[in-house]
Amino acid sequence: MNWRKKAIAGWKKPWLHNGMKHLEKQFSTIASAEHEPQSLKNLRNSAFDSFKKTGFPKKNWEAWRFTTVADLVKTPFRLSTEADLPEVISKSLDNLPFPTLLFVNGHYQPDESTQPKGINVNTLIDSYNEDAKLVTNGFDSGSSPFTVLNTAMMNSGLHIRISEDFENHTPIRFLYLTTKLSEPIMNHPRLILDMADNAQANIIEEYRGDSSDSYWNNAVTVIRTGNNSKVHHVRIQNEAPAASHLASTIYEVGAKGAIHGCFISAGAALYRNDVNVTLLGERADVTLNGLCLSRETQHMDHNITVDHTSEHVTSRMLFKYILAEKSSAVFNGRAVVRSDAQKTDADQTNKNLLLGNDALMYSNPQLEIYADDVRCTHGSSTGQISEDALFYLRSRGLDAVSAKALLINGFANEVVDDINNEEIRDYTRRLFESWLSGVTHG
């Protein structure tokens, strides 16, 4: 494209230019922080230069064909500071009895948090000073531009070490609350969990908002397992209706290690999660389940890559979407099997239920195989509620609303029932039932 065409393109979309200028202004506030080491400032500057060079995602990017960030870019989000904390902080919004590490408007609240025995909690700054690779370690390479932006602007976060002695029957919850504020804010949290060899843990990562105004969370979560360590990770995205939630979830699984990830999404006007899994050691295993619940004009997008790099590794992927009204969603699932990953066993399935004629679903399961002794399958299906099934339930005495709700429940239960912890499972089911009630009775 020559300079004239570039000028015309820029004139047609001045909001892209204005959005970048606004981010530059916000970046300057964190880049000038006095308490940070110079090496971290250099890292931030390098990452932001990289983000500016790449720019915001464009429609001609294959992974972003069906997701636009135009409304997000047009909104002048301000980077949150500790001055944005409410006068009274309360997490008593539910009855979950789990140890909870609480973030409010992007900022960790140690005095309001409960830390279980057997884990070590450090701020990102402390871990960076100990070893920069603990916080970065090449996560930005080939990733979403928003992961790079998180590196540049990460304004909160924790590094967690979980030892072999940790009693995994007690789940650990990381709760991110966004409260009502007078102007749109953004946060770039980073959560890193390192599992020792033979360690086990149940993790809940939850995002919630009670603001009716727009805000933006751009989160990065990294879970690294040691050899023979096991993690159950439930990620719940239930942001406020006007929020934007962009995320990068990174799993690195060691030999004989296993991660069971479950992604529940019901909130935000715009939601996108780039999930990148690397099976690093022999007999590493990953399970990825997802349940996306969208309505009105919500848009939800999962872009998933599972990289099989060693022999005898297994992966299972099941993502289900339920779309109501004029909502839309995207599923991109990609399994890569390297030449050294013989005996790989990989399966991915995407099933989608449309509750109306105006909902839109884009599904693209992919296999990329460079080994010859593997078992790999993938499939996708999209449809509406069966009229025959509805008729049968009506003939058994159910009213139309109850019959519809029963069928939708049956569709979702395959994901919810696979959550291993009963209290987390019940909590997730209540969230789903609340959403379903709004759809069927609203």
Residue ranges and their predicted role:
Residues 120, 127-398, 412-442:
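Conserved beta-strand/loop scaffold segments within soluble protein domains that form the structured core
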Residues 2-220, 224-230:
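Short, low-to-moderate order helix/coil transition modules at the start of elongated helical scaffolds
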